[in-house]
Amino acid sequence: MKSIYWFRNDLRLEDNAALNSALNNSDHILFVHIDDDMNDAECEWQFPRRGQHRKIFMYQGLEELQLNLKSYGHYLNRFVGKTNLIFQELINRHHINSVYCESINAFEEQAQERLIKDLGVNLYSYYQSSMYMPHQLPFDIKDLPDVFTHFRKNIETTGIVPEEP
């Protein structure tokens, strides 16, 4: 099976459930990062979606990721443009069956995932943005304590251990 591993915000090679799944379930993997055009546009309130510091931080992280992938004999394919159009081209050119990525719970990022599904490939997205998964918590997300100390004490008394990827 040919897959794409789509690096979004999480640029880790270790402790990465989505990447582990891609590696375990794919014969060939194309490693991809897309800097979507929308990141440089202003939002509806005329603020930049991404500031200069974030750009520099991402650039440095991507450079380090490229070096890390290279040490394993792989290459990070970096693109700038519209995410759905880039994926359409990659899927057609490389006969991709599946896309693996981290799940980002934000409106535009979820819309990107829907567009990729519409291209006819399997999309496997993994929530990996926090130490504890929502199903591990001893309460519903809607009942999340307002104060961190209450959250911490609740977690400490239940003995929950973060899941391995």
Segments predicted by a language model, with ranges:
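Trp/Phe/Arg-rich N-terminal binding region typifying the photolyase-homology
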Residues: 1-162
